[in-house]
């Protein structure tokens, strides 16, 4: 028996149309602000083999894979003939591919495309304590404590580790303008001889900056908060130097031998602290004290799942025997 439906008193519910206020800002589907990434852009120090466009060897510097340059939206000096994907004209950088010492299925050398910054100007907005990295897996296993020389791995055996320090950095041009998206600070994982000299010069720069500021402002101070230091422009000077435990085990290392010195007359050119637009953004990053601890937790979780890195992780030759393990594109992208 078919039941006849009564439509007489049935009203169809109509969708409610909501009009935005006249001055409302509409969502821009094509805006770069919609870009996001779970990866932390990163770079590493390389001690030699860098050449200019004419093939001349030009020393040591900080190398970034082009994948990471895209993540942080590094600025470009492109010509009219370049397309949007061009990575040959990254501002303040020299193109340099890193040889992985591996070959692909066709027998061709696997080269990671990237670029080097030789004379950086930077805001160091984060500095971790010394961290321990497993020599076997490359994962971070904790904070170094005086007296540590080994740690217990997933198999219960004691393993050797290397010490590293991580920095969160915003790179600037000569006019102290950011060279990349400042919502994407870049992580530098420093190890071996590079770490020791870089950190020593960073601390020396900070004390020199305090002295210059106090002389100029006629104030007395022996130390400043991290937020204050993060707004001072550190411009380290690099050179390539042979380092190693013995003459037969030496290789080229990136050594920080100095920095642009702040004085009471020029300190303002090496500071963004009075730039209101920059202050709040830099301070937000500085107040994020947990950034390096999160990477430790992430590495510990991975080390429980796999004792050794996957085969598709790319390894690169390090500066010396103390610097044994470095991830390729994947680890550089995730800041490990």
Curated annotation (Swiss-Prot):
Residues 297-336 are annotated as: Disordered. Residues 297-316 have a biased composition (Basic and acidic residues). It holds the Pfam family DUF5895. InterPro entries: DUF5895. This is Uncharacterized protein 254L. It comes from Invertebrate iridescent virus 6.
